[in-house]
Amino acid sequence: MPQLIPFYFMNQLTYGLLLITVLLILFSQFFLPMILRLYVSRLFISKL
C-alpha cells in the first residue's frame, strides 16, 4: 500500500528524534557527570 509509506517514515522520524532526545538527556544528566567525576578523581590522585 503506497499510501502508508509517508506515514511510516514520519513515524520512524518521530520515534528516532524522541529516542535521540531521551538519550541526550540521559547522557547529560547521569553518565557524563559520573565519567567527569571519575576523571577528576584520577587526576587529583595522580597529583598527590
Curated annotation (Swiss-Prot):
Keyword DNA-binding in record: no
Subcellular location: Mitochondrion membrane
Main location: mitochondrion
Keywords: ATP synthesis, CF(0), Hydrogen ion transport, Ion transport, Membrane, Mitochondrion, Transmembrane, Transmembrane helix, Transport
Topology relative to the membrane: Single-pass membrane protein
Stored InterPro entries: ATP_synth_su8_fun
A biological-process GO annotation: proton motive force-driven ATP synthesis
Any one Gene Ontology molecular-function term assigned to this protein's record: proton-transporting ATP synthase activity, rotational mechanism
Superkingdom of source: Eukaryota
Ranges annotated as spanning the membrane: 12-32
One cellular component (GO) term of this entry: mitochondrial inner membrane
Its biological purpose: Mitochondrial membrane ATP synthase (F(1)F(0) ATP synthase or Complex V) produces ATP from ADP in the presence of a proton gradient across the membrane which is generated by electron transport complexes of the respiratory chain. F-type ATPases consist of two structural domains, F(1) - containing the extramembraneous catalytic core and F(0) - containing the membrane proton channel, linked together by a central stalk and a peripheral stalk. During catalysis, ATP synthesis in the catalytic domain of F(1) is coupled via a rotary mechanism of the central stalk subunits to proton translocation.
Subunit structure: F-type ATPases have 2 components, CF(1) - the catalytic core - and CF(0) - the membrane proton channel.
PANTHER family: ATP SYNTHASE PROTEIN 8
Family indicated by similarity: Belongs to the ATPase protein 8 family.
Protein name (Swiss-Prot/TrEMBL): ATP synthase protein 8
Organism: Candida glabrata (strain ATCC 2001 / BCRC 20586 / JCM 3761 / NBRC 0622 / NRRL Y-65 / CBS 138)
Organism ancestry: Eukaryota, Fungi, Dikarya, Ascomycota, Saccharomycotina
Gene: ATP8
